Every structure is written in C-alpha cells, then in structure tokens.
Amino acid sequence: MTHNIHDNISQWMKSNEETPIVMSSRIRLARNLENHVHPLMYATENDGFRVINEVQDALPNFELMRLDQMDQQSKMKMVAKHLISPELIKQPAAAVLVNDDESLSVMINEEDHIRIQAMGTDTTLQALYNQASSIDDELDRSLDISYDEQLGYLTTCPTNIGTGMRASVMLHLPGLSIMKRMTRIAQTINRFGYTIRGIYGEGSQVYGHTYQVSNQLTLGKSELEIIETLTEVVNQIIHDEKQIRQKLDTYNQLETQDRVFRSLGILQNCRMITMEEASYRLSEVKLGIDLNYIELQNFKFNELMVAIQSPFLLDEEDDKSVKEKRADILREHIK
C-alpha cells in the first residue's frame, strides 16, 4: 500500500523549504469578551456556543469546525497539525476557525474565549504578528474585547495579561541534545523570562530533539520588544547548535556518522517502531543530511514528524498495528 503523507500536512508546511534548525514559528494572541464569563466557568454549554456564534460572525471568511461534531481521531489530527491545543479538546463547547492553508487558526473557548494563531516556516515573527494582529483588528471591530488601560488585555491566566501574546519558535537541536546542553540553556533563558518546552508546548514531551522556545510573560513589554528579545534568544541558541555540530563533525566525526547511519538503517528496514524512537531516528538522519554525510531525495523532516503520529495511522482499514504502519511509511519515504 502506498501512503500519501502529503494529504495529512497543512499547506503552509508543504509549500516551504526546510532549514537545518528552525522548523516553524508561531504567534498566539489571547483575547476575552466583555460581559461573558470565562470558558472554564460556563454554567452550561449554551454559554460556550453563544461565544462560538459571535466569533464566527466576526470572521465570516474562516471555516468553522465545532469539536462536538468531530470524532476523537479528527480532533487529535488537528492537535498534531498544531491547529488546536490538547486543552481545547477537553472543553464541552469548543470550536476552531481555520483559513485555507491552515496557517491561521482561531481557537474558541479554550482557556480564553479567543486564541488567534499564525504559523509559518520561513516567515519572521514580525510578519506572523502582523497576520495575527490583522485578525485581532477584525474581531475588535465587531466584538467588545476585554482590555484595561493599565494592564492591557485581560486573560484567564495572569502570565498572559498585557499583550496577551505568546511568540514561539520550533527548533531542531540534535547537537545540543546529544551533548546534554539543553538543561543549562533552559535555565539560562528562564532567567530572562523565556522558556523551552516540548513540541506541543507546556507539559508536552520532547520528540526528535525538537524544542519550542517562547516568552513566558506578556506584561510590561510591547509586542515588538517581546519579538526582538525572543529573536535574540533564538539566534543565540542557533549559534550554539551550529558550533556543537561543527565540533561533532570535527572531533567526533566517526561516532556521529555511526549514529546517523545506524538510525538510517533502522528507519529503512524496521518492521515496527514507536513514535518516540522514530522521531529520534529521524532527527539523527536529518543531522546527517545537514552535515552532508548522506543525501536523501525528498526527505521532509517536518512532514514525516507529523505523518507518523498515531491519529493519521488509524485511518487505514487493515489489521496492522500503529507501530507497523509507522514503519511502513518510514521505509517507503526514506530512500
């Protein structure tokens, strides 16, 4: 059976070339509506559905997807594509508005009434902020957004009060991970109000040496200041990763090549494999490609990291386990 993994990938991810370290960037804006209790305090589901209707009316050009009308597998696919958060699934009256290429989404009734997301691979944080801000302006023309002249935008979580903005960059950091530098880096940037998390944000697991770097606080700084400082933090981490890769290539080349080719051999020959192992093997193969140890046609790290997740493997109508299907996809696409 041939597996067309491209059907499971958002258009914005497919249309851009991959880079050695930066995988994607995201801007998220949290907003709430005046005269509505917050989502976690709804008395009935109807409170939530009223908010959904109001937000949908304000953004008529987006496609609405109500989570109560979707099965669990479809919801988890949207989590895997970063269109919604795992927390949104837990809400009884939740929805998401999505644009054509899925680079823009608006979650409704997560922790806050509205969470605007703009995502891209080769787009700067400032450009993404401009896109998210445009949606914010459109909402503001139709809805009464909670705002305080002294504090800024009012949010459910105190750490989001102010700009209500979380900026984040997803980085592939195999060198720093292999050399066990990530804990020290996380401690360092934490002192400046920035944090490193797993692939799906707070409390999520790290897969394939992939980390999300983002700001922690939004009060007392402008959107531009947050973006500029995060960009400096990310550039320093990228610099450190490049230095480590150079050292691995110069002083530990045989060991690094052995690691890369072992992972390549496993991915090309495995008959069953877990998500955790597959992600780390893919990461090491990508490292080998970036260091010019190997050349693979059409190797797409970002796309494969999405396509091998369980929600996309449960579609197949056969008796194979998820681990077997994952191995089939990897053998087929890594040649």
Swiss-Prot record:
InterPro entries: Arg_Kinase, ATP-guanido_PTrfase, ATP-guanido_PTrfase_AS, ATP-guanido_PTrfase_cat, Gln_synth/guanido_kin_cat_dom. ATP binds at residues 24-28, 82, 115, 166-170, 197-202. The keyword Transferase applies. Pfam families: ATP-gua_Ptrans. Keywords: ATP-binding, Kinase, Nucleotide-binding, Transferase. Residues 21-244 form the Phosphagen kinase C-terminal domain. One of its GO terms (molecular function) is protein kinase activity. It catalyses: L-arginyl-[protein] + ATP = N(omega)-phospho-L-arginyl-[protein] + ADP + H(+). GO terms for cellular component: extracellular space. GO terms for biological process: phosphocreatine biosynthetic process. Its EC number is 2.7.14.1. Catalyzes the specific phosphorylation of arginine residues in proteins. Belongs to the ATP:guanido phosphotransferase family. This is Protein-arginine kinase. It comes from Staphylococcus aureus (strain Mu3 / ATCC 700698).
